């Protein structure tokens, strides 16, 4: 008898988890938004920067601390496998300057469409949108199911399962659904949650020249971060200077 697995969150990670688990198990993919891939839709300014075509060392050198943590996952499914996965799902890709990989169409909706195609092809996967997970049920250290609330009728119902995959993302963009729910559930199931801190932050610059350039998007900008004589970072890329209200 096939195992029953619940995947919470239908972003890129959740959809990939459902597709993989669906090869050998019955999967219920639950999304609280009315559609899948809401954050994926806006990434890369709507173009969806899928991955980078660089060597493994490029990835590991970009991880500020504890890059060894990424070794097993990266070598199990590296960037080339990601690209092959999407192209086989009818989402052709292109490589731009700096090794950045985008869909040929420049539309993130094509990446989402590739995931949806693979989900729809697999009869072992059921997708449930507009449904919010309220609780992960545990007994004697074992996950036994989830409690959900469907938006349409506001009624709570329990769903039994053998395992739960939490793919709810962080808490960086609440408007897309990343509200930090996964941390709360993990803690209640016995995991230790460390204090969170943002990994992507804006720079506030005092110089008047930056204020004069508000609203511009610049290409091939070199960034050097130094403290005293020590240089911490050198990077080149696109620089966006938002307009302050």
Residue map of PLM features:
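Glycine-rich FAD pyrophosphate-binding loop
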Residues: 22-45
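N-terminal Rossmann-like FAD-binding beta1-loop-alpha1 element of flavoenzymes
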Residues: 3-29
């Amino acid at each position: 008898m096939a195992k029953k697995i619940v995947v919470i969150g239908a972003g890129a990670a959740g959809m990939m988890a459902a597709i993989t688990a669906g090869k050998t198990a019955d999967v219920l993919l639950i999304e609280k938004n009315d559609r899948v891939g809401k954050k994926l839709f806006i990434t890369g300014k709507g173009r969806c920067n899928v991955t980078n075509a660089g060597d493994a060392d490029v990835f590991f050198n970009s991880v500020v601390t504890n890059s060894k943590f990424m070794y097993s996952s990266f070598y199990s499914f590296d960037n080339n496998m990601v690209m092959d996965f999407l192209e086989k799902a009818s989402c052709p890709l292109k490589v731009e300057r700096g090794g950045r990989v985008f869909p040929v169409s420049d539309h993130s909706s094509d990446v989402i469409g590739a995931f949806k195609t693979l989900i729809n092809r697999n009869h072992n996967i059921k997708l449930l949108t507009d449904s919010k997970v309220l609780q992960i049920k545990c007994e004697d250290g074992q996950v036994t199911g989830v409690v959900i609330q469907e938006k349409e009728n506001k009624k709570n119902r329990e769903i039994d399962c053998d395992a739960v995959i939490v793919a709810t993302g962080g808490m960086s963009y609440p408007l897309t659904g990343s509200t930090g729910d996964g941390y709360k559930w993990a803690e209640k199931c016995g995991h230790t949650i460390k204090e969170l801190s943002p990994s992507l932050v804006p720079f506030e610059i005092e110089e008047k020249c930056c204020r004069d350039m508000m609203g511009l998007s610049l290409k091939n900008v070199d960034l050097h971060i130094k403290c005293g004589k020590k240089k911490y970072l050198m990077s080149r890329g696109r620089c966006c200077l938002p307009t302050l209200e």
